Amino acid sequence: VTLANGADNRIVTTTSTSGLNGESNLTFDGTKLSVQGGLIHKRRAVTSNTTAANDDYYLGVSASSTVTINLPNASTLTAGQTFVIKDEAGSLSDSVVINLTPAGGQTIDGQSTLSLNSPFAAVNVYTDGATKYFIY
């Protein structure tokens, strides 16, 4: 990897044959980020009740009984941060659901809990970075 250091420690040029990995926060201040090739998101397998970590992105649920995923306090996240939750097993029904629950007093599109109960259902939620989550 070759990085050229510009003003204010900004990367002005980068070339790599093996990729660029940001160990902490990698921020692009321009108008767009163009990615050629694939984009790989972090995936975590979920089989029982859990709390999403601040650095989670995709939570793939495979469970034969109801699972509750507690979302982090929105104020600990960056506005626009996204979580994807998916029933990978296709086992959801009226009696087997995925419940998404934000931190106390916070909401998802105005609701205190969001429940998925259709086989292979998925939902994308993002936060305002303060008190709310939204479905998109």
What residue spans do the PLM features occupy?
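Beta-strand-rich interaction surfaces with strong enrichment in secreted/lumenal proteins
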Residues: 58, 111-116
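Short edge-strand/loop segments of extracellular domains
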Residues: 101-109
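Small-residue hinge/turn detector
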Residues: 11-14
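Short loop/beta submotifs within extracellular cysteine-rich repeat domains
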Residues: 19-22, 108
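Disulfide-braced loops of extracellular cysteine-rich modules
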Residues: 2-6, 20
